[in-house]
């Protein structure tokens, strides 16, 4: 069944984004927050925490590259890394041999 749901996110008084939801893939509440995974028309799968967009298939690389590359570039040989948060798994660097995740929110892993 097609969804008539739109996700709207406002940023200040003059800027916002709207996403057409094709299907709700998961919706639940955890100990810490609400967690939703939806299929959108233009951005693919989207993860929302408490109704706020965390990451989308279309542009996740922008988010993950920004938070991963700086620490990876300052270390001469990043083989073993600890990732705090990052339950979606997108931060793990290609150069890493072993990655350890510390994620308190089981619902987003």
Label each region the model flagged.
Residues 1-46:
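N-terminal auxiliary segments of SAM/dcSAM-dependent transferases
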């Amino acid at each position: 069944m097609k969804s008539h749901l739109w996700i709207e996110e406002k940023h200040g008084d003059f800027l916002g984004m709207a996403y057409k939801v094709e299907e709700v893939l998961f919706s639940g509440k955890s100990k810490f927050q609400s967690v939703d995974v939806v299929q959108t028309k233009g951005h693919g799968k989207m993860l929302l925490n408490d109704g706020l967009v965390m990451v989308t298939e279309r542009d996740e690389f922008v988010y993950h590259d920004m938070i991963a590359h700086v620490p990876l570039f300052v270390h001469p040989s990043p083989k073993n890394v600890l990732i705090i948060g990052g339950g979606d798994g997108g931060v793990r660097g290609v150069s890493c041999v072993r990655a350890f995740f510390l994620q308190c929110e089981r619902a987003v892993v």
